[in-house]
Structure formats: C-alpha cells, structure tokens
C-alpha cells in the first residue's frame, strides 16, 4: 500500500538530507509505528506519504514514494485526498470550519459524498471518539485534547485507505488516548486500513503496532522489524521495556500485562528494600526522605527516562530558598505508600516557617465561559520550590487554571493572587517577572525569524544579560544553529525554545501546559533535569499534563481535576498509585508495591 524506494529529502538551504535512503514497504491492513528521537525526520517521512513533502514544504525528494500505486512526486496532496488521511502535530492547522460537526463533515463534502452517508458517518464518529456532547461547540472553545480528537475524527469520516498520524495522542488524557488507539486498531483489523503513525509516547502505542520502523539518528539507516526486536536495540523505549531490560526479561515485554506475569521475582527482590522507608535508598541517598535522592546528580546513565530524584515526595528540595525544612523518613508500617514514600508533602505545609509565604494562592475560583462552567470552587496554594502536576481528563479545566494564574483568564468568582498581585489586573511587563507560561502551542510565543533573534528579544524583554536565553536553549536544545527558523524546528524543539524564552525572565512561578508534547525520552529527561534545578533554586513549577510518566518522575504533588473541580490533591504516590488511569507503567507492573519509576527500581537493586 505504501512503498518507499531509496527516499532522501533535502530541504532548501540544508547542507545534508533530513532523511536518507529510506527503503521499506507498509502492506495493506498493517499498523506501522515510526519511532526515533526528536529531529530525526519522522514528520518528513510522514509528509512524503501525503504529498506535503515536497509539494508544500519545498525541498528535494530523491527516490520514489507510492501510495496505492500513485507516485507522490507526480500527485499533489489534493490528488491523494481520497486515499490518504493525515493528522499532523498541530490540530488547529487542519481546521477549516467553526464547529465540531461541520469539521467532521467537511472532508466528505469535498469528496462529494451523499448527504445521508455523511450524516451516518458523522454520527458514528461522534460516538467512536466521545465527541457527541461537543457536536455544536465552536472549535475555538475546545481544549487541546478535544481539538485533537476532532482532527482525528475529521480524517476518519471520509474512510481513507491510508491513515498518516503524527503524534495522535500527544494532547489526550490516558483514557481518551486508549479510546482513540482502539478505534484506529479496529479500522486496521476490521476494515483493512493501513496506518503509519509517529508517536513519542511509546508506552501508549507500542502494543498496537504490527511492526516498528526506527530512525535511530539523523541520516541513519532505517531499522524495521517486529516490535520486541526493534525495542531491544532502540535508543528510545517505554518504561515497560526499560524495566524488562533491567530485569533481564527475554523476550522484552511490550504491555503491562506481559510484564506483570513475569514480575513476581522482581517484586520479591524489591520487597527486601522497603524496610528503610522508601525505594531507592542507599547509594546516592541524600537522607532527606526523597526516593533515590542524588541519583540523578550522580549521572546514573539512564538513556531515556531520567532519574526519579524527587518523584512522589513533598515540596522540600535541598538547597531551595526559601524552602521547608529537610524531612526525615517515616518509621511506621502503616501500609506500603506511607512506608515507602511518607507524607512529606502534607507535613511540609505545616512545618514550613511563617515567612515562607505561598508563591500563589487560589481561593474559591470559578470561571464560566458561556454555558460552560470551566472551573468551580477551586482552592490551591503553591509553595516555593514545589513541583505540582495538574492532571485530569481533557476539558477538566487544567489550562483554564493556568490561564487564571497568568492573567489570561478573568475569574467569574473567587480570587487569584500571584506574588501578592492579582494577575489579570497586573501589567504584562510587571507580571512577566512573577509568573511565566509555556502554552500548549509554543508557536504562540515565537515571532522572530531565527533562534538567535528569538533569544535576543527574550533577553531584552526580560532585561536579562545578553546570552541568557541562548544559554538555556543550549541546555534544552543542544545542536540547534542560531540561524534556524523556529518553524523549521520539530514540535518538541519549538517547545524547548519557548521554555527558554519564558525562563529568561527568571519568574518564581513557572507554568507549563503539556510540556512533553512532541518530546522524545531523551529530551524529556533533559527537561526534567532542568526543571529540578529550577525547583532547587526555589522556583515553583506547575505542569498541566497527561503524561503520567512525567508526573511520576518529577512532581512532588498531584492535583486531579474533573469537571472543573479539584477531586484529589496530595503527594504524587498517594494520588497516582490508587488511580487506574493515572498510574505510571512501573506502578501497574509492580503493584501493590507503589514504585513509580525505573530509576527508583534501578537504585534499589544496586
């Protein structure tokens, strides 16, 4: 169905091809996962299938790509539209109508399908993707995850023979992601649809793939094979695979179910390490009650997930200024969670000195948007040096809460104070030194034509020393040239640049909306390392995320939202271990022991 024959793509002005010598075939009715680190050319390969490369992007395509026998060099994207449906990383760029129902129907209208067929398929898609309650909603009022589901639905309704999906679950909550992937799998198995998908969150998708096509590095040869074979040599892998490597399991498990079947001996070994109060105690332990504290600083050599230095603990961080006093591990035996992780976050709130005032306080916050009550009676206090993950379903109110903290959203009721001021009443030039937001769409912050110009503008706006932003870019995004245009960066690279722009002003409160969207595991590990350093300096970090692995690695505290209300607020381990939707893979595999990360397990087994 899809055939690549010695394909190389070189963009205008580039010295080297973005991808080189791609040669493989995707048969009809097969789901192939395209994997690899950020920036290796996955989106370029996908674009070559739809004809966007080179007809829209420019550049030179050498070799040949055929889809259902049509050569994409001689067929423009509109001539492939009846065969190929494409969902890119940015759902907004796909929308051409104003409401959900109209968007689902638009592709079928363009193909001239009869009205009765269109009506039936729209209803089917609304039900399949859980969009029925949103059918009349304006697209601009939807959350990022809801927009992503609409974008996927809009390419499903014309029933294309080939689906090209670029990060299709990046903005979806875990439950919604499973629903969408189940629909895609059903199309493959029942209708023979051919799917080529790129996705960084391999823990969500690897079990659905018939084969994996791995781009291990820029310009490197493509590696194609069965999922377990490719994962054995891949530089990027999900936690279940990394845990399998650590435990020496062969073949490597790809699902939580497979891993649990083999995990009993590992659980028994780990149970021996629980008596001292927390997982990961021992080498590198700082003695302050943090799991595996110090392991990340020692450089354990983790290739993907980073080190669980602070996972599941309270807001106290060694060296933070100001910060709650150091914690001592609990010595009770009242259950695994308390023994292993303690109740540090709750204690820290009462033990903090009086002068350590909250960085931000939200009291009785309510936000109404038309008929939708986005937030209801939300109370939240954020302490210096604390890392908080806001989690919940798409549309739960996470982005609205972040918008309230940064002054983009005016409360309908209640109060919001950040650094002693009311955000929506504070001039932007003053507020930028108190709070910074990296939005879901990083392009909203990027206006210059080069990385260097973007960094120079950020330094001027923040009144920071020249080179401040560029140094941050070097840490978060190594290897990117000053003359690179932000639009030529991958989604993950643009996010890293936007984060550097925000951090140039050194705000004490840093807000990030879906910060790992588009990031591979190595880039996520670099982000975690940098955010930990900010927390050690006393900055408060608030993440709105669907990435349960990020929350397990980084967050001291998790706040769960549902229908605009806070339904849970506590230490990471206490909240996520008991949640079937928001528990990380390691927790599910090793339950009832509440380990959160591979790094904690590795540290315990030393």
Model regions and ranges:
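Conserved ABC ATPase "signature" C-loop
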Residues: 218-219, 564
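Conserved ABC ATPase "signature" region
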Residues: 117-134, 464-482, 492
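Helix-to-loop junction immediately C-terminal to a conserved catalytic motif
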Residues: 50, 406
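ABC ATPase C-loop
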Residues: 155-156, 503
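Conserved ABC transporter NBD signature motif
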Residues: 58-70, 414-422, 431
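ABC ATPase nucleotide-binding domains
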Residues: 228-282, 304-306, 314-338, 582-606
């Amino acid at each position: 169905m899809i055939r690549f024959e010695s394909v190389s793509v070189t963009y205008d002005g580039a010295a080297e091809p973005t991808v080189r010598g791609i040669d493989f075939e995707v048969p009809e009715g097969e789901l192939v996962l395209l994997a690899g680190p950020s920036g290796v050319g996955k989106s370029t390969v996908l674009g070559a299938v739809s004809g966007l490369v080179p007809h829209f992007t420019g550049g030179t395509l050498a070799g040949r790509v055929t889809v259902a026998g049509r050569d994409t060099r001689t067929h423009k994207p509109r001539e492939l539209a009846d065969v190929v449906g494409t969902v890119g990383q940015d759902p907004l760029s796909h929308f051409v109508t104003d409401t959900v129902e109209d968007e689902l129907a638009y592709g079928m209208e363009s193909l001239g399908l009869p009205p009765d067929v269109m009506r039936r398929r729209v209803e089917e898609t609304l039900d399949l993707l859980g969009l029925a309650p949103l059918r009349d909603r304006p697209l601009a009022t939807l959350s990022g995850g809801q927009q992503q589901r609409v974008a996927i639905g809009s390419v499903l309704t014309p029933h294309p023979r080939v689906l090209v999906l670029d990060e299709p679950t990046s903005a979806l909550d875990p439950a919604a992601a499973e629903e969408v992937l189940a629909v895609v799998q059903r199309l493959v198995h029942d209708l023979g649809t051919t799917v080529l998908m790129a996705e960084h969150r391999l823990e969500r998708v690897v079990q659905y793939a018939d084969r994996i096509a791995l781009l291990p590095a820029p310009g490197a040869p493509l590696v194609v094979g069965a999922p377990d074979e490719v994962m054995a040599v891949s530089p990027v892998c999900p936690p279940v695979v990394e845990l399998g490597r650590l435990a020496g399991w062969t073949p490597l498990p790809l699902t939580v179910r497979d891993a649990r079947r083999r995990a009993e001996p590992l659980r028994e070994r780990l149970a021996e390490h629980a008596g001292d109060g927390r997982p990961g105690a021992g080498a590198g332990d700082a003695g302050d009650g943090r799991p595996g504290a110090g392991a990340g600083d020692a450089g354990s050599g983790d290739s993907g997930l980073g080190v669980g230095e602070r996972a599941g603990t309270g807001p106290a961080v060694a060296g933070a200024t100001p910060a709650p006093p150091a914690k001592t591990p609990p010595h009770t035996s009242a259950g695994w969670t308390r023994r292993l992780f303690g109740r540090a976050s709750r204690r820290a709130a009462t033990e903090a000195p009086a002068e350590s005032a909250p960085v931000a306080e939200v009291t009785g916050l309510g936000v109404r948007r038309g008929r939708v009550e986005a937030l209801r009676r939300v109370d939240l206090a954020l302490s210096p040096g604390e890392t908080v993950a806001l989690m919940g379903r798409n549309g739960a109110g996470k982005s609205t809460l972040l918008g309230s903290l940064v002054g983009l959203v005016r409360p309908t009721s209640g109060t919001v104070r950040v650094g002693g001021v009311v955000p929506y009443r504070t001039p932007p030039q003053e507020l930028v030194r108190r709070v910074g937001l990296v939005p879901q769409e990083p392009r909203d912050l990027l206006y210059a034509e080069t990385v260097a110009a973007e960094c120079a503008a950020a330094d001027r706006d923040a009144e920071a020393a020249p080179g401040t932003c560029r140094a941050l870019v070097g840490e978060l995004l190594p290897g990117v040239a000053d003359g690179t245009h932000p639009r030529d960066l991958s989604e993950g690279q643009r996010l890293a640049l936007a984060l550097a722009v925000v951090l140039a002003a050194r705000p004490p409160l840093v807000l990030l909306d879906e910060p790992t969207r588009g990031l591979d595991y190595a880039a996520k590990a670099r982000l975690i390392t940098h955010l930990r350093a900010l927390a050690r300096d006393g900055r408060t970090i608030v993440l709105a995320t669907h990435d349960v692995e990020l929350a397990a690695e980084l967050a001291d505290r998790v706040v769960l939202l549902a229908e605009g209300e806070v339904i849970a607020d506590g230490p990471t381990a206490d909240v996520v271990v008991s949640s079937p939707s928001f528990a990380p893979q390691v927790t599910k595999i090793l339950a009832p022991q509440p380990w959160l990360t591979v790094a904690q397990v590795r540290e315990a087994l030393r």
